[in-house]
C-alpha cells in the first residue's frame, strides 16, 4: 500500500471512529455458507477499515428483507441476494416500496442438481431425468420407504421452492422424495454416501465450497426457457405450488448484496462502502471452502481475505 493510501486510510478510520456511535450496522446472516462468508467480509471491512461496529443477525430471506424494509436498524443488509430466486422480495421492497437498495455489482451464480462423480459414472447418471429410473431411485433410498432422497435446499430458501416444483414437473415424484434440511445435513450426507458407496443427489450451485470438497458433477437439464419457467413464491400466493410450472434449467443468476435505504442517514460511510462492494464467484467459493471444509471460523476467514486483498478493499473504499 502506498504512503498516500496509508494516510488516507488512517484519516478515514480516525474520522469514522470519532463518530463511531453513528457508524454501526447489523448484517443479516442467512444459513448458506457463501452468505455467511460475505457477511463476515462486509463486517471485517466495516470494523477494521471504516472503524464502525457490527452485529451479525441470523435470519431467513423473508425476515431480513422485512427488517430492511422497516428501516429501524434491526437488520440493515442482506449479504447474498440471488436473482431471480429472490425476485419476489426485490420486486416488493426494491421496486415497489423503494425501501431497499440492490447493489449494481453482482457476481454470477449457477444452480442445478448434482451427484457424486463415482455414483454418476457407475450408473450412467448424467441428466436430471436419470433420477426417475427405478434402479437409480433404489440406490438413493436410504430409509427404505421406496423413494430416493433428493435434497432440494434448506427451509426458507426460495430455491428450495423452485426445486420442489421442478421435481414434480420433471416427473420425478413417483421415484424421488424431495427433502428440505439444513445445508450441514446435506454436506454430511454427501460425505457419508461417498464413504459407504451409496447413491445421493442434491441441489447444488456455484459458487460453493462443495466443488472444492468433493468430486461432484452437475446434471444436465433442459435449456432455460422462460415460457417453461413460471415460478410463484409463497410470499406472493398461498397456492404457489399449484400455480407454478418449472420444467427447465434456471437461468444464470446475478448475486449481490442489498441494504436498507435508512442506512444512508444512520451510517453514511458504511452505506457508501456497500454501494462499491464487489466480489467474484471464485472469491466466494474459496471463502466457503475455508469455512466448510477446513472448519475455520467465518470471521477468521474474512480477516485473512481482507488482508490478502487490501488493494481491492481500498478501491471499494475509494482510496
Report residues per predicted region.
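Pocket-flanking alpha-helical
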Residues: 39, 59-97, 188-189, 209-214
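A bilobed periplasmic-binding-protein/Venus flytrap-type ligand-binding module shared by bacterial periplasmic
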Residues: 111-121, 254-266, 290
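C-terminal functional modules
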Residues: 250, 263-264, 271-319
Amino acid at each position: 500500500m502506498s504512503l498516500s493510501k496509508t494516510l488516507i486510510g488512517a484519516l478515514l478510520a480516525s474520522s469514522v471512529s470519532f463518530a463511531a456511535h453513528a457508524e454501526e450496522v447489523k448484517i443479516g446472516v442467512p444459513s448458506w455458507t457463501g452468505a455467511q462468508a460475505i457477511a463476515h467480509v462486509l463486517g471485517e471491512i466495516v470494523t477494521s477499515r471504516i472503524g464502525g461496529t457490527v452485529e451479525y443477525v441470523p435470519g431467513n430471506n423473508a425476515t431480513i428483507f422485512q427488517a430492511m424494509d422497516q428501516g429501524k436498524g434491526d437488520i440493515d443488509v442482506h449479504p447474498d441476494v440471488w436473482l431471480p430466486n429472490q425476485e419476489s422480495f426485490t420486486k416488493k421492497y426494491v421496486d415497489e416500496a423503494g425501501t431497499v437498495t440492490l447493489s449494481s455489482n453482482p457476481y454470477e451464480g449457477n444452480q442445478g442438481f448434482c451427484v457424486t462423480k463415482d455414483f454418476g459414472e457407475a450408473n450412467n447418471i448424467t441428466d436430471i431425468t436419470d433420477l426417475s429410473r427405478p434402479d437409480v431411485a433404489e440406490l438413493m433410498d436410504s430409509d427404505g420407504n421406496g423413494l430416493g432422497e433428493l435434497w432440494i435446499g434448506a427451509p426458507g430458501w426460495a430455491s428450495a421452492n423452485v426445486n420442489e416444483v421442478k421435481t414434480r414437473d420433471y416427473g420425478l415424484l413417483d421415484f424421488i422424495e424431495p427433502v428440505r434440511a439444513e445445508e450441514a445435513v446435506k454436506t454430511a450426507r454427501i460425505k457419508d454416501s461417498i464413504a459407504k458407496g451409496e447413491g445421493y443427489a442434491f441441489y447444488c450451485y456455484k459458487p460453493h465450497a462443495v466443488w472444492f470438497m468433493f468430486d461432484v458433477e452437475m446434471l444436465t437439464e433442459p435449456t432455460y426457457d422462460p415460457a417453461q419457467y413460471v415460478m410463484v413464491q409463497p410470499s406472493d400466493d398461498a397456492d404457489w405450488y399449484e400455480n407454478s410450472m418449472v420444467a427447465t434449467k434456471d437461468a444464470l443468476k446475478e448475486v449481490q448484496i442489498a441494504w436498507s435505504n435508512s442506512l444512508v442517514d444512520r451510517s453514511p460511510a458504511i452505506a457508501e462502502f456497500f454501494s462499491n462492494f464487489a466480489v467474484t464467484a471464485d472469491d466466494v467459493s474459496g471463502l466457503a471452502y475455508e469455512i466448510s471444509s477446513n472448519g475455520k471460523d467465518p470471521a477468521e476467514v474474512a480477516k485473512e481475505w481482507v488482508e490478502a486483498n487490501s488493494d481491492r478493499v481500498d478501491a471499494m473504499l475509494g482510496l
